[in-house]
């Protein structure tokens, strides 16, 4: 008799995705982050659901409701800090996942890659709106500054900003709609994840060598399930250590002050995972130019497949491209540091140089070096 997991209409979908899925035998730990992101999403949805049971999206009570969750709700502080630091873990895994895709040339699977970029935008939008909900100083001013950027759009900008605000400033209407969208978006993200996996399983996984692995496949279970469980344990250890020992390490102290429209904080900055994009935004003196650079800093990923000039898919056998890749990583870390610094000399000039380098590496140097490598290999 055939196993039920292979015949049942629902179970056979799970079976072909998680149990009997043929996977390349050479996948390294860099391929763990997809499953870790799935776990992060589940953790965020669950903790968020319980937080939403106690949160009130009203400007008069939002800040106090978060305090109430931490002080009066059973293990409310664990829920709150798991959710806040879970977002940081989510972004760490996201950036490593994208980095892996860039390094090993996974972007050649364009449908999967483009859905991934869409997912990245959706997660960033969700995180931004979530940061507004505690209604602290940084929440309020962050929302004001970032939504105000849309006013740079010619002709419709001002109307668009007021439409998003639901008035003439960030107020009760803004907070309520941000809460509604913050609750809704993770479920849209979950649906997009299914589409992401659907396209991935059409082509099969890439592997570190970048060479087709159809001749050498192994079943996903037990080999990669046990590998994913190890990755999960490491991530959960890191997350629980962060939550239990220094929950505010990655947060901003200003957010423990209730929002006050009459008092601007000395340095308005987003959460750490947006600092690189914020630095690129600030490095251009023109408002519209800054907004365009901000959007392009992520959207540039969409044209990476078109800029692939190498005859090899992966970077594993391309030392010159590897040097450029790690230069890009160092550049992004520099931008992240600059994003958290005040707008003054020498930070401004460093930020501008790092921003130019970021776009130059992706648009000019990567394709150029790939062509040079082809030439050196006489291809």
From Swiss-Prot:
Cofactor binding notes: Binds 2 heme b groups non-covalently.
Keywords associated with the record: Electron transport, Heme, Iron, Membrane, Metal-binding, Mitochondrion, Mitochondrion inner membrane, Respiratory chain, Transmembrane, Transmembrane helix, Transport, Ubiquinone
List of residues binding heme b b566: 97, 196
Subcellular location: Mitochondrion inner membrane
Annotated GO MF terms: metal ion binding; ubiquinol-cytochrome-c reductase activity
Membrane topology of this protein: Multi-pass membrane protein
Miscellaneous comment as given in the Swiss-Prot or TrEMBL entry: Heme 1 (or BL or b562) is low-potential and absorbs at about 562 nm, and heme 2 (or BH or b566) is high-potential and absorbs at about 566 nm.
Family of the protein in this entry: Belongs to the cytochrome b family.
Subunit structure: The cytochrome bc1 complex contains 11 subunits: 3 respiratory subunits (MT-CYB, CYC1 and UQCRFS1), 2 core proteins (UQCRC1 and UQCRC2) and 6 low-molecular weight proteins (UQCRH/QCR6, UQCRB/QCR7, UQCRQ/QCR8, UQCR10/QCR9, UQCR11/QCR10 and a cleavage product of UQCRFS1). This cytochrome bc1 complex then forms a dimer.
Protein name: Cytochrome b
The organism's taxonomic lineage, starting at the top: Eukaryota, Metazoa, Chordata, Craniata, Vertebrata
